[in-house]
């Protein structure tokens, strides 16, 4: 009798220990499979754990990890045309990351969960490149070279909106 109870308790403790999942401070765990309410009261099919741990119910839930690390994008555009029709090559670096705020994490989970870091980088890079092409097309070559800081600021401002919606 009591040996059976002890064995059952050990099995339950092991199951709990095996299903308790943790993430570091630079990661978010997205647990999907059951309905949860957001702080705003909206029903969603997942819950979020930032830098901690939680029990993931076997069979009913699945845990995925989303990185909050800074990602560096190497931007290299060839033959981008300015407003005057002059072809220029544009090289630069952009740094992007998923914000640690709940709404930004929910949005990123809906867009990127299950994708590799390389796939996420490629999507962000294509977004930045598209905006970069559009901005270069509105400037002269003199504007680009004389006002590099203003040019970089404009690229950041225009890209930020689309990147935030990802």
Please give the residue ranges for each predicted region.
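N-terminal hydrophobic membrane-entry segments
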Residues: 1-166
